[in-house]
């Protein structure tokens, strides 16, 4: 494994030596690994050239952006010289929004108010989070961050999951999402 300011270069066997990063959600599009203070996200469907080009462009944009509400990509990851994912700083000691149920009511209100304000700020900048769910909203003290932001719709870089459905004229949101409770 070679790490520079902008990239991490791996060979496939390097992944065998990295611990999987345990999260509360099941990642269908990627595998997560932990390397010191970095979370490495390696996409599973790396043979889809168009998808990977779109993701790489999005990572390039996000790396140079200053969206404080996002856990931003730090490095692009290449495996055997092909774009394979990205790294981001580990948001140490954070919890997902799924853990909010155990907090006092005033803390819940504070966290959810901040989430709402952060979403408003993101939407004002014409960014739509493509994978917005409780597992991708992290908090630590009074800091709220959105994870898994490579699925966002940013300008002409569309949400990977929903862009085709959103191009239809008549959209029924219950047909876009597979779980009605996510809406």
Outline where the language-model segments fall:
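Catalytic-loop of the protein kinase fold
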Residues: 119, 123-140
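Juxta-kinase regulatory segment immediately upstream of eukaryotic protein kinase catalytic domains
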Residues: 1-21
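Conserved structural core of kinase catalytic domains
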Residues: 70-111
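ATP-binding glycine-rich loop module of kinase domains
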Residues: 19-76, 100-101
């Amino acid at each position: 494994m070679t790490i520079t300011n902008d990239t991490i270069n791996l060979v496939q066997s390097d992944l065998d030596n990295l611990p999987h990063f345990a999260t509360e959600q099941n990642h269908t599009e990627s595998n997560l690994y932990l390397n010191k203070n970095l979370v490495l996200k390696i996409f599973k469907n790396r043979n889809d050239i168009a998808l990977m080009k779109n993701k790489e462009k999005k990572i390039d944009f996000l790396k140079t952006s200053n969206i404080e509400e996002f856990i931003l990509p730090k490095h692009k990851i290449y495996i055997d010289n092909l774009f394979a994912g990205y790294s981001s700083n580990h948001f140490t000691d954070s919890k997902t929004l799924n853990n909010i149920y155990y907090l006092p009511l005033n803390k819940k209100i504070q966290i959810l108010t901040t989430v709402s304000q952060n979403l408003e700020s993101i939407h004002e900048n014409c960014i739509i989070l493509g994978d917005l769910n409780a597992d991708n909203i992290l908090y630590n003290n009074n800091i709220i961050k959105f994870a898994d932001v490579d699925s966002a719709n940013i300008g002409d870089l569309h949400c990977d999951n929903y862009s085709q459905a959103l191009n239809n004229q008549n959209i029924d949101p219950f047909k876009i999402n597979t779980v009605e409770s996510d809406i």
